[in-house]
């Protein structure tokens, strides 16, 4: 059974590569986003992962920066099931065979860490994308954790929403056993684990629910990017605690939506 699911994943990856190579050059933004969402839903379904949206789900189609805690390489596809976004990733990912090219074709913005000039370039690109109506998703911790804590947020990229005059949307991610609701570390891409090792852990685990909790949009304050980063982290920490059952959910209508129904199955 595990071998068949791995084969299905390989075929699904090939389908994604062909879609990007053959169709994407001829498609508009809306149709590309439909394909990205559909492909991501199918990937998660093969992995045995369902999606649950919790809290006041933000209005789609408006430019903003989404900030979230980072647990797994699955995070990107989980977020795509809600709304396809532009992600900021380290430049090394671009050199990964096949996957790097796939990320580039789906709009990932790559940054060379440690190069100040490149950080300025990426800030400019993020600002432009948001002003054009795109959601840009960043993981300000700069690394992955097992989900038990939220590391301090780096502040550099927070300059982009300040410059654009657009909001920051705090989001918390949590993976749990679909049957018991208990937190699972199977998807955690941490320490010396490789991508294939985490994939094996996911495929061997019981069905998983990926929870996405949304907070209220944050506006830039007079304190600048450092204050905005700290405020965003506080919001994400509060959301994580809510997911763990230690605090009430944020105001708004809660929603529990399976991945298969988060979007229409027909491109607009």
Name each model feature, range by range.
Residues 226, 231-268:
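Cytosolic-facing loops and C-terminal tails of multi-pass membrane proteins
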Residues 98-100, 148-223, 227, 231, ...:
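A cross-family acyltransferase "interaction/gating" segment
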Residues 2-5, 36-91, 102, 146:
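Conserved H-X4-D acyltransferase segment
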């Amino acid at each position: 059974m595990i071998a068949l699911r791995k084969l299905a994943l390989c075929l699904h990856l090939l389908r994604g590569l062909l879609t990007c190579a053959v169709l994407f050059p001829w498609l508009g933004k809306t149709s590309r986003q439909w394909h990205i969402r559909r492909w991501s839903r199918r990937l998660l379904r093969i992995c045995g992962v369902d999606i649950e949206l919790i809290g006041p789900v933000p209005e789609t189609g408006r430019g903003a920066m989404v900030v979230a805690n980072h647990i797994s390489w699955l995070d990107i596809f989980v977020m795509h099931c809600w709304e396809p976004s532009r992600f900021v990733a380290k430049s090394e990912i671009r050199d990964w065979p096949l996957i790097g090219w796939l990320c580039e074709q789906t709009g990932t913005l790559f940054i060379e860490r440690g190069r100040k000039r490149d950080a300025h370039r990426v800030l400019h690109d993020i600002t432009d994308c948001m002003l054009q109506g795109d959601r840009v998703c960043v993981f300000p911790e700069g690394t992955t954790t097992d989900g038990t804590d939220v590391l301090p947020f780096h502040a550099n990229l927070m300059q982009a929403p300040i410059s654009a005059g657009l909001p920051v949307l705090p989001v918390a991610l949590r993976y749990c056993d679909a049957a018991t609701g208990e937190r699972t570390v199977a998807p955690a891409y941490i320490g010396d684990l490789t991508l294939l090792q985490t994939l094996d852990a996911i495929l061997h685990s019981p069905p998983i629910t990926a929870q996405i909790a949304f907070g209220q949009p944050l506006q830039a304050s007079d304190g600048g990017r450092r204050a905005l980063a700290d405020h965003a982290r506080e919001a994400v920490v509060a959301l994580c605690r809510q997911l763990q059952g230690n605090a009430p959910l944020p105001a708004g209508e809660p929603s529990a939506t399976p991945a298969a129904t988060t979007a229409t199955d027909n491109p607009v």
